[in-house]
């Protein structure tokens, strides 16, 4: 099983889109942890409504403490052999989990990282795609943390939401 941790803070309508992209995954053995970080716009209520429709979704709530605290709370409650993150304004391609899992199993990697499309609105409100690196497997045979630190030093921009650990 893969645990997907999604921090939620005042996500509004974006939350539904993000959750639907997770539910459409070709690999269905996952749990989705929606961690509400003290939203004030009804996002927590929406998270609970979404959880009623699919038993793979669990909702955790905490007072507003920031995205890192929300991710850490999710880590404390995840049950999967693997875990990944998906932010509340992200969408996952339908084969994202399957692709990462196949790469991890076929290489024996400790961490796999996927490619991504980063879209930002320009001044005119039009989506602009920014450059992104391809996916890769990270095989660590060094003491815990040492190999990953070396990987981070050799890589470009780092995000937690395009990797599976």
Where are the regions a protein language model picked out?
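Nucleotide-sugar donor-binding/catalytic module of glycosyltransferases
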Residues: 1-165
């Amino acid at each position: 099983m893969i645990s997907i941790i999604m921090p939620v803070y005042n996500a509004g309508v974006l939350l539904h889109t993000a959750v639907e992209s997770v539910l459409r995954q070709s690999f269905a053995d996952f749990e989705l942890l929606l961690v509400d970080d003290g939203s004030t716009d009804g996002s927590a209520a929406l998270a609970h409504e979404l959880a009623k429709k699919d038993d793979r979704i669990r909702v955790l709530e905490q007072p507003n403490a920031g995205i890192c605290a929300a991710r850490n709370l999710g880590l404390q409650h995840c049950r999967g052999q693997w875990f990944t993150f998906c932010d509340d304004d992200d969408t996952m391609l339908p084969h994202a989990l399957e692709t990462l899992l196949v790469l991890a199993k076929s290489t024996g990697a400790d961490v796999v990282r996927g490619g991504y499309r980063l879209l930002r609105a320009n001044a005119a409100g039009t989506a602009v795609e920014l450059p992104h690196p391809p996916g890769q497997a990270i095989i660590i045979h060094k003491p815990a943390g040492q190999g990953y630190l070396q990987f981070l030093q050799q890589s470009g921009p780092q995000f937690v939401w395009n990797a599976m650990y």
